[in-house]
């Protein structure tokens, strides 16, 4: 083995070997165990959330594969309609083109080119992370098979009355010209205004105070043009007499009713609210309750129409409402119209006041434009009938959430579910399988030929396919079964569905998880007709945040590519990556500045195993992950520790009883074997409970502290003793090898590369013949090998040796200087342990002699260590240079007195305490406490040595 651990020298070659040998594919034996990779968007590269997700899934798959399950971990990518289309449109913009210049067909060719380039990048990253996915079964949400499955699902749901076309309110992105989902809307806290406007009462009506108008508060005066009512709370006594009467809409002159609705808060503004059902989601619900007309006043750009479009709630045209709008606002942008409308209201004496008001402004997460609630014709899935069985599946335990608290989030969403808008006004995506004749009649089918045959439409009937595409979440909602060959009843579908675990972030429980459950249970049935669930367990993890706890996003410029931590990256390359191809290029300068501050030298190379172990160690259930580069560095050191331990073992492993020779186990051998059994049981238990943090912690504790720090040291006296019995030396060598071999198997799901590299060399010494560690059996604890007596003896020894180390450090006694020991309160067990381990203590702790004192015996002035009730005394006389040590201590005491005075003065200065941030003050207080404690310790030592 190389002297130093170089991850890059081993990682790629091992991955290529595993893949070429087909080790990632199902091995054909055992009960199935399936995970479908949540398909990353084919829009560039994987981020830290994907890296975390992959580390968790691969740990599960490698663990279950070693347990003998027939594992399938299937990879793939998502076409990510809106995000991908935007990226390609931006590339065209740079060349002075747009998609309409190219036309739909040529534009889609460009997107496919981008997909091939980007998808290859994602596959490379997944490989580099060591993910043991079955590449022979890689899928893409728009490959031929999945496209057929999407059409099939749409047609079946339509035939079952669960998909319909309707005119409803959607989140409309006025820049991208498409409906977007709630997930793609970000609510920004902004300082805005509340306009208080006079709405004249019609027909001579008056308020209780005798006024002939109502004052209505609004944050969007431009939507006044589409008002359908003014609402008041039914219990608001000020307005009860006016319910059912009318106001005249300012600037427009249209009569609109005064209605009573609990939605109105009497404490907000004047208690009167304008209702614009076609441009506000809450108003739309009020409109439904009161059968109000829907008046659309904007076009797709959010420019004011010359006359409103009036509809009834069922989407039919309302011909009773006056749709005339003032000509001066026609074709004005909504925000330009706002200024004009407010000015006109003011001129007519209808503007009462403008108040400052904090509000949430919805913006498209990709375009950055203010989202407009807009009335359009869209396709919808009727979700309530699908939600009921999906709720029952979680209630009765067929699907379990880990941690369980996320079930409540799931239930609250599902019990208040709204119909799902599945159409998008894009070109990139699954085109909706619906056709229209020239009269506007719609026909749904798998293809045009089927539609013509089913509805007996001759060649003379001109059909036009719907231009819209399906929401990306629709195709990804079919992911667990469409990727296994559905609608064909393939062998893979029969064996590997339902899948076992879905690993996902909490932020898409509703958008993806719930929809997968609903669609799968409706479309996939068992032989007895009962619905299949898509997965048995949903493991929900938190978001991976940056070191400051901020969510990672391209717009914040804090996204890390996991491969940059694996392979390292220069500062210049990191800046280029973070600031190029941005949706909002104006943020580039700010992002460059913060990147230089955080990574002035770029990012060092840590290797895949260190990054994966970091992810697993941070995976406490359900909490957000604050990513810490310091942890990665620490686990890179852990890899070095394992590497160096393996080199020591290989150096000592020439005769370890692999051919059946006699051997004898020392106390230390029995102890480490016993500790190994406990570690095997603990790591297994925690992995089965999805506690990757506790599993990795148990493994780290065993390998670093027990095996490397203690057992390797305890093995040396046996192996270095030329007079030791051959059987005992062989027993220690055998234990060194076999415990390391098992520890490597335990660590393999977390750190696949380093464990494979070392295992290949260790396995033959342990008498194991196998091609790869990944197909070796998972270690199973043997309770018969737990040796409580050996554990007790070694813990006693460790306490004694640590006590002596501390005395050497405190008293500045060199590590090679032999120590005479006096022992007080030594019981029979203590004396037995001393006698049995005398040789070991003399070699490892450099103990010169032991003297057991009786109750009446007086010990010389000594430094003391406690091991239970046993007092271990190290006499100071003769061990230290008294004058030199006193001089050294005086120097330290003076330095600490100065530090205590300096920090104490700072903290007693009111000017400093009043101005400094709390964190700085806390740091200074901690520094003072530390210095005071150190001063007390050194003063005590000085007194003890002076008394010698």
Curated annotation (Swiss-Prot):
- UniProt keyword annotation of Protein biosynthesis present: yes
Xref: CDD domains: Anticodon_Ia_Val, ValRS_core
EC number(s) for this protein? 6.1.1.9
- PROSITE patterns given in the database record: AA_TRNA_LIGASE_I
One GO term under biological process is: valyl-tRNA aminoacylation
Q: Where is this gene product found? A: Cytoplasm
Q: Which UniProt keywords apply?
A: Aminoacyl-tRNA synthetase, ATP-binding, Coiled coil, Cytoplasm, Ligase, Nucleotide-binding, Protein biosynthesis
What is its quaternary makeup?
Monomer.
The similarity comment for this entry is: Belongs to the class-I aminoacyl-tRNA synthetase family. ValS type 1 subfamily.
Main role? Catalyzes the attachment of valine to tRNA(Val). As ValRS can inadvertently accommodate and process structurally similar amino acids such as threonine, to avoid such errors, it has a 'posttransfer' editing activity that hydrolyzes mischarged Thr-tRNA(Val) in a tRNA-dependent manner.
Protein name in UniProt: Valine--tRNA ligase
Its source organism is: Pseudomonas putida (strain ATCC 47054 / DSM 6125 / CFBP 8728 / NCIMB 11950 / KT2440)
Task: Please state the gene responsible for encoding this protein.
Answer: valS
